[in-house]
Amino acid sequence: PIPSRGLGDVYKRQILLTIGFGLLAYSLSTFADERKDRSLIFWRSLPVSDLTTVLSKVLLVVLVVPLMVIPHIILLQLVAMISASIFFTTNDIVSFGWLWGSYILTDWFRIVFSLWAQALWSLPLFVWLMLAGTYATRPIAGAIIPPVVLIVLERIIFKTNTVLEFIENRVGFWSRADSFPKEYNEIRVVDISDIFLLFSSQAFWIGIFASMVIIAGIVYVLSL
């Protein structure tokens, strides 16, 4: 299983970064673009609640997009495995059967689980960007200025960096290190068992609660 796991881990950061930037851009622009082209008025004329509209966009970010990358994952890993097979076979480094005896299919799903875990971990950022797109004339400024003000005020008044640390943690990759920094300090593709670890993390549920509050704010702004 070593070759396949190694290839999967190599893909992890590239895939997470690519999808992550795409989701951040989508989250920031989705409601902002609808306000600009007036399509928001059309959607509000449909018999669909604002909450349903917001949740559909959140589910797209968290669940649907990770599934859309499966074909790309399969293609990339097959190309890498074929290339490695040719190289190893011609150089008598490792047997062809041992290389393809790795858990390729398992790795594909592990990467998808990694994307799901990361999307849930970074959900507060996604919904915050959506909120900025609903009320701010300049969404980028609306997304950046309020957190900066909170960070500065917290530092001046309380001499702490809770807000800054929260944002830094959500921007970074989630790993076992976020729950057990001493015992598990590696960054790797998430195993299915890590999902249960994520769900048992207090920091995860704090993020989910913050996301729910922000989603409520989005629904309120849309209803105005």
Feature roles, as predicted:
Residues 24-27, 39, 128, 218-221:
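Hydrophobic/aromatic residues in alpha-helical transmembrane segments
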Residues 126, 140-153:
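Central hydrophobic cores of alpha-helical transmembrane segments
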Residues 129-141, 193-224:
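Junction motif at the cytosolic side of a transmembrane helix
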Residues 30-60:
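Helix-loop-helix units of permease transmembrane domains in multi-pass membrane transporters
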Residues 82-93, 160-185:
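Juxtamembrane non-transmembrane "cap" segments at the membrane-aqueous interface
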Residues 4-36, 185-209:
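Membrane-embedded or membrane-proximal helical elements that form or frame transporter/channel pores
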Residues 5, 9-23, 56-130, 134:
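Secretory targeting signals
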Residues 30, 115-122, 207-211:
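Residue-level hotspots within the lipid-embedded alpha helices of multi-pass solute transporters
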